[in-house]
Amino acid sequence: MIHQLLAEFMGTALMIIFGVGVHCSEVLKGTKYRGSGHIFAITTWGFGITIALFIFGNVCINPAMVLAQCILGNLSWSLFIPYSVAEVLGGVVGAVIVWIMYADHFAASADEISPITIRNLFSTAPAVRNLPRNFFVEFFDTFIFISGILAISEVKTPGIVPIGVGLLVWAIGMGLGGPTGFAMNLARDMGPRIAHAILPIKNKADSDWQYGIIVPGIAPFVGAACAALFMHGFFGIG
C-alpha cells in the first residue's frame, strides 16, 4: 500500500514537473524556449506523462482514473481517498519543484507578466469563462481520456500503454484543449493551484478557487464515471 501510494505521489509529481515546467519555459522572461507555442507545450505534456508511466508502471496519477478503476472493481473503494490525496500532494510538490527551478525567471517576470498569466502557468483556466460550458468541456475531455486509456489498456503489447496514453493526451490537447486547457485530472489542476496559493510569488493573483473546484475539480470525476460505465456496458471492459 505505502509503495503504491508513493508511486502515485512521485508519478504525479513528475508529470507536473514536465507539464508546469514547459509552461514556465514557454512564458517566463529569460528562458531559452520562451514563445515556443502551444504545440511545444502540449507535446511535452504528452511525452511527460508517457515517461511518468514508464518509470512508475501501473499507476493512475489521476483521481478520475482512480474513480473509474473503483467503479470497474479493479481497485478497492477504500483506496480512492488515499490514492487521490497522494496524487494531489504530488501535484503540489511537483509545482513547488518547478517554481524553485524557475525562481530567477519568476523574479525577472514579476513586473512584465500579468498575475493572471502567472497563475495560469500552474493551473488551468478557460479561454472564455462560461462555467456550464467549461464544465461540459472538461466532462467530455475526461470521458474521451478515460475511455481511451481503458481501451488502450486492453492491448497487451509491452510498452503500448505509456505510449498510447501520451498520444491520447496529445490528441485531446490539440483537438479539445482550446476552451479550458484540458485538465482532466484534479491532481493536475488542484495540486499546482494549491502551490500557487502558498508560494511567495510576487504580484500574484488570487487562485480562482471557484473555477478550480467546479470545473477541473468536479467535471473530471463525472466524465470518468460515465466513461467507466460506458466502456463496461458497451465493450465489457472491467
Swiss-Prot record:
One of its GO terms (molecular function) is glycerol channel activity. The keyword Ribosomal protein does not apply. It comes from the Bacteria. A motif (NPA 2) lies at residues 185-187. Gene3D superfamilies: Glycerol uptake facilitator protein. Keywords: Cell membrane, Membrane, Transmembrane, Transmembrane helix, Transport. A motif (NPA 1) lies at residues 62-64. One of its GO terms (cellular component) is plasma membrane. It is found in: Cell membrane. Disruption phenotype: Cells lacking this gene show a decreased lactate transport ability. The keyword Transmembrane helix applies. It is a multi-pass membrane protein. The chain crosses the membrane at residues 2-22, 39-59, 80-100, 135-155, 158-178, 211-231. Belongs to the MIP/aquaporin (TC 1.A.8) family. Transporter that facilitates the transmembrane diffusion of water, dihydroxyacetone, glycerol, urea, H(2)O(2) and D/L-lactic acid. Is involved in the cellular racemization of lactate and lactate metabolism, but has likely a more general physiological role. The transported molecule is indeed lactic acid and not the lactate anion, in agreement with the assumption that, with very few exceptions, MIPs (major intrinsic proteins) only facilitate the transport of uncharged solutes. This is Glycerol uptake facilitator protein 4. It comes from Lactiplantibacillus plantarum (strain ATCC BAA-793 / NCIMB 8826 / WCFS1) (Lactobacillus plantarum). The lineage of its organism: Bacteria, Bacillati, Bacillota, Bacilli, Lactobacillales.
